[in-house]
Amino acid sequence: MISHLSCITNSLPPTELLPWLNIEGSLTALLEVKAGRPLLVERRFEGYRLLSLAQKKQLGIKGAALSHPRLAWVREVYLYGNDELPWVQAQSLFPLSSLKGSARRLQQLKSTPIGYVLFNRSRTLPNQRSIKHTADGWQRQTLYDWHGRSLLISETFLPRFCEKQLDI
């Protein structure tokens, strides 16, 4: 049996977590199936922030543009499944250049999971993904191309999700 700590501290993700880190399509939909109910979204932050150099690079900004300040709409949330502790910590970065036309609704999500909007018409979206270990847990960072707009979404699987997934 894998312990709670190994889910957080191993250099490689637990085998049982790999499908969740690599899934294409809506993570929201799969988490709701696992929870047996809609996800509860707790907003931690919504507002404008300057992008860091690393975030600019992840969004594909290159050359001299890297040295210029860039604002993004940032949304940070906890996603709850079917218990009192959050399963996933998520951060969504929407560069201002991506928030034009109908994409402006991404600033008005409130307690709606972003997956409801992104995967409303398509089961998958063009993306680039990386997986890394953070102090909070295993994280997938996905750069989506949503109708020609770049969106960077980071989803960290928290200890409670690992415990439930691994049946600890």
From Swiss-Prot:
Protein name, UniProt field: Probable chorismate pyruvate-lyase
Binding site for substrate: 75, 114, 155
Known function: Removes the pyruvyl group from chorismate, with concomitant aromatization of the ring, to provide 4-hydroxybenzoate (4HB) for the ubiquinone pathway.
EC number: 4.1.3.40
Keywords from the UniProt entry: Cytoplasm, Lyase, Pyruvate, Ubiquinone biosynthesis
Name of the gene: ubiC
Main location: cytoplasm
Example of a GO biological process term: pyruvate biosynthetic process
Domain of life: Bacteria
MF terms in GO: chorismate lyase activity
